[in-house]
């Protein structure tokens, strides 16, 4: 984070879009401020093309005036029912709203809105770090307005609400998810009173639509260390309401002195591991769900101890129901996660034994195009604290990958090798090894490589005969 004076802020806002905003606001004699995430990210040195503007008065009027000033390159959208507008210009999105104050009923997160002051608007913001504003009017251009010491919280790495957190979260329960999400994204801590309010108000999450919750979960999942967010959701009690199947994994049971590992924290370790190697959202979710079937499959065996037989299959059958409840897409993405969960034990079984061509080929055939993702998941699943055992698995997985690459290369070459070879050409045209044979072989190979003909006998034979005739060779009669 950097320390910025008002003069520094004015310098950073010395961009055409902000000067245009300043000019139209002054022409309309309206106070105009850039607020929220854009201001926060200026201090954090995080690039942003999304600009939120609050106008004390009509935000729509300022948006319309800005569009007129910018001309055809700007695109204006007006949402009069909500009193908001948006201008898109050269890759930037500027959102406009009039300063307002809000009140809520207990059974809805949709507020009753009325016109207000900048102070009213800052009061309704979710967190102090998002409640800072910078004036854009020429006389005060670059002046920071920070009534809740959001800058101090930004410096200290704290997530805190501007007003009473119980009111903040009860009024709009989605803010509880946003609280955890910001803490995860920014690697901040949730202030104690704010966290306690999360615990007290967790049941209010039930009035939030599944789509909104899913959006916040996905944002947590796309951070560098999603485990931080899921631990916070678990600690405050939200996770039990959103993903009860996952919280059931937070248990260690001991019998006859034999215990199984805590699969909740093992899973979070796997998720963090996989995030170092992929930005694929659904592969990350597959990592979170890979052992989701363990609580249902757990059995005690006097000889073997704790077992989780078929937990991969049981877990894969749970995925559609979880996706449906979370309002996740019920399409190829769901089937991909289901497939990864079902197959995640296969490479481990191969790596634990002798790595044979036939076993790897069966794996490659069953996994298809998803083989690389499956291998990435399985490598992330190695969390053993036994360094020797962990290294043995890593070495074996490396052998599996090498075998996969070798088989892919061999299959690729076989696929591109014309099914009519040189020996058949020589026999067909009564030739000895010669330049003519090489020319005919190359003709077939080029045609296959360039995808001009399929690598099938009949079309290749027709091409071969055509080329032989052009070369003046004796073509055998059928």
Protein language model regions, located:
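Catalytic cores of the polymerase beta-like nucleotidyltransferase superfamily
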Residues: 1-478
């Amino acid at each position: 984070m950097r320390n910025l004076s008002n003069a520094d802020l004015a310098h950073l806002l010395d961009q055409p879009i902000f000067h245009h905003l300043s000019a139209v606001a002054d022409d309309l004699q309206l106070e105009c401020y850039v607020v929220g995430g854009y201001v926060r990210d200026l201090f954090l040195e995080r690039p942003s093309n999304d600009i939120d503007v609050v106008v004390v008065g009509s935000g729509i009027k300022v948006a319309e005036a800005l569009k007129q000033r910018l001309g055809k390159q700007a695109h204006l959208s007006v949402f009069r029912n909500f009193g908001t507008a948006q201008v898109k210009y050269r890759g930037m999105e500027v959102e406009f709203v009039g300063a307002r104050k809000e009140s809520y009923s207990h059974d809805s997160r949709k507020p009753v809105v009325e016109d207000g002051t900048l102070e009213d608007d800052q009061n309704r913001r979710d967190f102090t770090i998002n409640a800072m504003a910078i004036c854009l009017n020429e006389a005060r251009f670059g002046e920071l307005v920070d009534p809740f010491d959001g800058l101090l919280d930004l410096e200290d790495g704290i997530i805190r609400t501007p007003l009473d957190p119980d009111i903040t979260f009860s009024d709009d329960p989605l803010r509880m998810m946003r609280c955890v999400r910001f803490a995860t994204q920014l690697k901040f801590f949730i202030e104690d009173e704010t966290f306690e309010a999360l615990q007290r108000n967790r049941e209010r999450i039930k009035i939030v639509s599944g789509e909104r919750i899913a959006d916040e979960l996905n944002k947590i999942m796309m951070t560098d260390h999603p485990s931080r967010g899921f631990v916070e959701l678990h600690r405050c009690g939200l996770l039990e309401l959103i993903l009860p199947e996952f919280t059931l994994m937070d248990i260690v049971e001991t019998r006859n002195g034999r215990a199984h590992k805590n699969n909740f924290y093992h899973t979070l370790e796997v998720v963090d591991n996989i995030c170092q190697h992929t930005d694929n959202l659904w592969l990350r979710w597959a990592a979170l769900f890979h052992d989701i079937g363990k609580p249902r499959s757990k059995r005690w065996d006097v000889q073997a101890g704790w077992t989780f037989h078929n937990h991969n299959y049981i877990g894969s059958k749970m995925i559609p129901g979880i996706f449906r409840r979370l309002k996740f897409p019920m399409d190829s993405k769901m089937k991909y996660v289901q497939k990864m969960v079902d197959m995640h034990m296969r490479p481990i079984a191969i790596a634990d034994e002798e790595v044979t061509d036939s076993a790897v080929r069966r794996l490659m055939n069953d996994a298809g195009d998803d083989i690389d993702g499956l291998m990435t998941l399985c490598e992330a699943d190695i969390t053993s604290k036994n360094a020797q055992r962990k290294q043995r698995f890593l070495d074996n997985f490396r052998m599996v990958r090498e075998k996969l690459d070798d088989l892919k290369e061999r299959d690729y070459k076989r696929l591109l090798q014309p099914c009519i070879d040189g020996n058949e050409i020589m026999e067909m045209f009564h030739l000895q090894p010669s330049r003519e044979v090489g020319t005919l072989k190359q003709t077939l190979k080029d045609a296959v490589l360039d995808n001009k003909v399929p690598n099938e006998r009949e079309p290749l034979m027709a091409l071969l005969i055509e080329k032989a005739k052009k070369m003046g060779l004796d073509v055998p009669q059928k």
